[in-house]
């Protein structure tokens, strides 16, 4: 637990790379994003004191008894909880020797130039300059040669060795020690074989500097001695203030880190691939789509977690196999197969992400596996009242022959619904996992002001409201998205109506998938990370008297890459859209964007320009009019204003 302010560190701060392809040699390192995050402003990395138990090191008297705890600052020590106090009782805190000076703060490392590269620059760097026409099985050798050529520029330089805390400590709080950083002097020597290609010789530089103020100098010396002063090269980050050659080396290291972090897959050299650089380009495009928001943040998080889980599972399997001394027992063989098939499953998911045709929408498979119930056997419909207590006042507007059923929560009400039923919700705040499983034709409506009937998503779930019912209607409600990764509302098939609703998005907006239909009237959509309403090829939507605003709230360094805003249409086959009396404003992309493949765009554009346009500035308007005709897009009396990129635009892909 840190005593000072905590640095912001991503959840995937540590990675496991396998530079020898099949994972025979694996090394842990801190991700490039973490390194950049700590030095982006060009200041020294904050130094802090922590509580941790040093790892016992062999070969020196007294090391086995060196399991003392590093002393924390007194102020933070006074804030210990009962749990921490119990831990301290088991193993008392021992102070660092008084004559031992605290480590100095680490100097800033070279800021990553990779972060500022455009998509085309990254593709050119990896495909044309580094990998060229190499095959997947040769990628390791090519990356090694590229790095060794750059390292010839300078044989000695200063860097920060950033490694997993487990190298130094057996006990530590992960939140307080994201990595252990030590200022070292690096000596570059030509590698003798493939196993030493990603290793480098280091020694502690003066003055002794670390991100952990009270780490003992002796402990660092002992760890390095045990490692024979050889550490993974990709764990070393050159520091600022050296000559220009160091910046070339720093970029080369970042290029190789990014390759193993994001572009390399362990299965690459196990499968035939005619054009490996084309595959690398596709992965670069995937990464850029995540960064610029084409793939919304919450959905991108799913991919990152899947990739991280795949890497971890692969390392687990390698470690498990290496611990089997002789012929495996039946139980060990079963466990190996279990771990192997987990890896195969994750591998399949990652391949789906890399295929543009398969990653059209988040999870790649239907979200609803529940079958339709249909109507009740006796043919009657029931009105479900959702309220903790029910009074006669609540049902005074219902006819005397209405069959009623009262429920304490919305989930239970939805679980008891059959086609034709109505769910009435009174003011309050609700959650319902069953909203993501709408298969029957029901009406869900609030009674009272729509702002007072709040339905929030469960952050632990992927989806919020998902429907494949033939005809489902939501009325007079507020849907508030919290943490779910899919669209706030996803219409998989059938028809959904949203009437007088407020949709406060946190992930993507309303998604209408191929073949589905949506009608939205008198509603408000705001806060989506992508478009407020997204129409997939072959879908149908009618929007009337709605407000769609402040969508495409993406944190991206390249805002010009993100065009989505109020309404986005994906064509081929063309969706159908009718918009009447809507107000679309203050979106960061366009008010309405039409996403059309490049070849089809030029066909339509050429026809529009040759046949419909007269001259001058009218060409763009005529072309847009022609495209809108071809797309079956009808727009009447809409107010589209104050959108950052413009009102309406054809975007090519």
Swiss-Prot record:
Any GO BP: male meiosis cytokinesis
Record's keyword annotation contains Cytoplasm: yes
Region feature (Disordered): 1-65
Cystine crosslinks: none
Stretches with biased composition (Low complexity): 46-56
Cellular localization per UniProt: Cytoplasm, Cytoskeleton, Spindle
Keyword Iron belongs to the record: no
A family per Pfam: SHCBP_N
Ranges of biased composition (kind: Polar residues): 28-41
Oligomer status and interactors: Interacts with HSPA2; this interaction may promote the recruitment of HSPA2 to the spindle.
Protein's UniProt name: Testicular spindle-associated protein SHCBP1L
Species, as recorded: Homo sapiens
Gene: SHCBP1L
